[in-house]
Amino acid sequence: MSSFSDALWLGVQYAFFFVLAGVARSSFVFRLADRPLFWALLLGGLSGQWQPALSLGIVVELLWLDVIALGSVVPPFGTLAFLLLFPLSIIPGWSEAHQFLAPLMFAVFAAYGASYAERYQRVALNPLVDLVTAWFTSGRGCTPGQAVALGTVVRAAWQFSLYMLCYVALWLACDLLGEAIFLFEGQMGWPVLLAASMVGGILSLRTRRAYACLTGMFVAVCGFLAVTRLDMF
């Protein structure tokens, strides 16, 4: 793989994309930018890596089909999963489905972790409502504009930090494991991975039980793959 400095600089650029996706996620003006396929089309055009961009975008999009918000559970960050995976098509230049399988599992858990982090971040920002209320009643506290600005800065900071943490962890794992991270080499193509991603039909229910079902499935698959790899050695 390329040097750590090159990979880190690429990660910083994609962290800013993730921040922009977060802004779109919390607005009603341009919600399309919160969808993985939007970033697949945009970054595929900018980089020229159309094949991995569209393939990854469709896979991640199918994992979360719940375009319409239903239920009270904070939806996972599908854009985080895509923006973690796509740089691997640039550094180190992967393009085959089996190369992305193990990183995809990590990216899915990262997307769910980000949704839980967002929930706690929303709770942490709740005191801003009291400050705005105090400003209206007594003139003390902060104005609505100040509250929005502070909330935006806090949100951007935690999204940037979260992306860089996940990106560095994924890049180091890929760098240390090398080709050992490739699963089912020569046995899995993009059509198989696209079919497997149809599990998004479960996630579209957006209930805790559906999420627990997916988590259990991934744990079972990871356990099976771990045993298979051990048997190979």
Sequence positions of predicted segments:
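Helix-coil boundary and interhelical linker segments in multi-pass alpha-helical membrane proteins
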Residues: 1-12, 43-54, 88-106, 176-179, ...
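Hydrophobic transmembrane alpha-helices
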Residues: 2-75, 79-80
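Short helix-perturbing small/polar motifs within transmembrane alpha-helices
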Residues: 14-22, 65-68, 80-126
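Hydrophobic alpha-helical transmembrane segments
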Residues: 21-23, 44-48, 64-67, 89-93, ...
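Central hydrophobic cores of alpha-helical transmembrane segments
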Residues: 56-60, 81-83, 212-224
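Helix-loop-helix junctions within the multi-pass membrane cores of secondary transporters/permeases
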Residues: 100-182, 194-196
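Alpha-helical transmembrane segments and their immediate juxtamembrane interface regions
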Residues: 179-219
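Juxtamembrane boundary at the C-terminal end of a transmembrane helix
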Residues: 222-233
